């Protein structure tokens, strides 16, 4: 078979941006602590490698990475006291009243990940599986680091003209789980099962694409779900227009419980220079 080796180094670390306080998708009732972003340096550089082999009817990959977690944890610094009132006491003197605030910084843990993947084709079917082990997770409500396993199995069907149907099942396990990790601000769960379904079809000589994507968290959607419908049309090689709708359902997950009323209709215009 043919083998390829890929290496990657990211010198400048960038994390996903949280919605601002008051946004419909902001999950908390109060502002988060300040975030610590690692300075660009050799010590903070993220690395990833992958080895892929392609054989007759199937392929396999091994990969590893050393990177920062996009999700942050709170590093507590203590408490800050602010004088908010003074109460006069009988016989003289006063009683100060202080407001206590928890002070912390948001930091990102350094993670180590190893994994593998395999894909097998049979006629119009593609079968795929992935397994990954990641160590180094840190949480606010526990002191020791945690490890996580992720296992994905999926299939794609390409037997219909201009149509692709894919179904993926993902199971996540968190080792050495502690009940305190379920509390604010971690909201961690010991196991999480997810199902993703994507159906796409092209029309008009592949200039128009219709896509349905649905994600179900939990075996019966008890942790929330969402669906996305979209249509994209290529007017020219440079100009593309799209329209779509997003629908959310709540569940036991605080994220979906907070956003289940945030259904959206959107328009996307893209011009490439």
Q: Where are the language model's segments positioned?
A:
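Membrane-embedded beta-strand positions in outer-membrane beta-barrel channels/transporters
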Residues: 46-50, 113-115, 150-154, 196-198, ...
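Repeated loop/turn-to-beta-strand initiation elements of outer-membrane beta-barrel proteins
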Residues: 2-7, 57-60, 124-128, 162-166, ...
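Structural signature of outer-membrane beta-barrel channels/translocons
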Residues: 1-2, 52-56, 119-123, 156-158, ...
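Detector for outer-membrane/organellar transmembrane beta-barrel domains
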Residues: 119-216
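Outer-membrane beta-barrel "beta-signal"
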Residues: 260-273
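Transmembrane beta-strands of outer-membrane beta-barrel pores
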Residues: 9-15, 55-57, 66-70, 122-124, ...
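Outer-membrane beta-barrel translocator domains and adjoining extracellular loop/strand segments
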Residues: 18-24, 73-81, 139-148, 176-184, ...
């Amino acid at each position: 078979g043919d083998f390829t080796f890929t290496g990657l180094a990211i010198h400048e670390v960038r994390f996903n941006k949280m919605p601002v306080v008051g946004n419909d998708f902001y999950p908390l009732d109060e502002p988060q602590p300040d975030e610590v972003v690692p300075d660009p340096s050799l010590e903070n550089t993220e690395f990833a490698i992958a080895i892929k082999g392609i054989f007759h009817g199937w392929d396999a990959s091994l990969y590893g990475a050393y990177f920062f977690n996009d999700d942050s944890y709170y590093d507590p610094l203590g408490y800050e006291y602010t004088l908010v009132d003074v109460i006069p006491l009988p016989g003289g003197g006063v009683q100060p009243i202080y407001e206590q605030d928890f002070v912390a910084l948001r930091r990102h843990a350094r993670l180590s990940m190893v994994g593998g993947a395999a894909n097998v084709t049979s006629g119009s079917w593609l079968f795929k599986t992935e397994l990954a082990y990641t160590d180094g997770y840190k949480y606010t409500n526990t002191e020791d680091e945690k490890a996580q396993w992720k296992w994905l199995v999926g299939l794609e069907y390409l037997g219909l003209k201009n149509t692709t149907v894919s179904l993926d099942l993902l199971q996540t396990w968190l080792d050495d789980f502690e009940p305190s990790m379920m509390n604010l601000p971690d909201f961690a769960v010991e196991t999480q099962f997810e199902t993703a379904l994507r159906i796409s079809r092209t029309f008009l000589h592949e200039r128009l694409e219709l896509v349905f994507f649905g994600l179900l968290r939990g075996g019966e959607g008890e942790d929330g779900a969402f669906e996305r419908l979209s249509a994209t049309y290529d007017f020219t090689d440079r100009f593309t227009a799209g329209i779509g709708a997003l629908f959310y359902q709540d569940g036991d997950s605080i994220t979906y419980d907070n956003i289940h009323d945030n259904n959206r209709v959107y328009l996307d215009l893209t011009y490439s220079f």
